[in-house]
A protein has these predicted regions:
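Vicinal oxygen chelate
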Residues: 1-4, 9-18, 66-172
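Core segments of cupin and vicinal oxygen chelate
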Residues: 5, 15-61
């Protein structure tokens, strides 16, 4: 079996949502994605910049629907990568200001992550990678990822001066 081309990447995720306006309030209003195209009340494309869309939202088969029951197969989470720890801190401030509950926060050795749910109960991971030269490795050179508590107070100190926040981090 052949290998995938090293230039291959994931272009976008397309989510079924129950309420397009509510989903846009989260992805555009809270997380800051740019609306690139909207198709009436049934679909929208959002971008982190420089691309036609990174997230698609639609109600074609899900208008007014409920999230899948726990214990079923499907998408675990969408991971949104930020270019720096400071950018992740700003995203965390926006999430906290919107009073969106956090499900967890972790240092994985290779990255630092914050976990939450969107309004349709889809898992969302907000993260930033650590520099590759700092990734933990075993004696044989293999990655040695781990999961440790991420200090949210320390992370929030990385946000640039003047970044507003209406509430502080919750203890996890």
């Amino acid at each position: 079996m052949g290998s995938i081309s090293p230039g291959t990447g994931i272009g976008h995720v397309h989510l079924k949502v129950a309420d397009l306006d509510r989903a846009l309030a989260f992805y555009q209003g809270v997380l800051g994605f740019e609306l690139t195209q909207r198709f009436g009340r049934s679909a929208a494309f959002l971008s982190a910049g420089g691309y036609h869309h990174h997230i698609g939202l639609n109600t074609w088969e899900s208008l007014g629907g409920s999230p899948p029951a726990a214990g079923t197969t499907g998408l675990y989470h969408t991971a949104i990568v930020y270019p720096s720890r400071a950018a992740l801190a700003v995203a965390l401030r926006r999430v906290l200001a919107a009073k969106i509950p956090l499900e967890g926060a972790a240092d994985h050795g290779v990255s630092e992550s914050i976990y939450l749910r969107d309004p349709d109960d889809n898992g969302v991971e907000l993260y930033c990678d650590k520099p590759k030269e700092k990734w933990p490795r075993a004696a044989d050179g293999e990655l040695a990822m781990y999961t440790r508590r991420l200090d949210l107070h320390e992370l929030l100190r990385e946000a640039p001066e003047g970044t507003e926040m209406e509430s502080g981090p919750r203890d996890l």
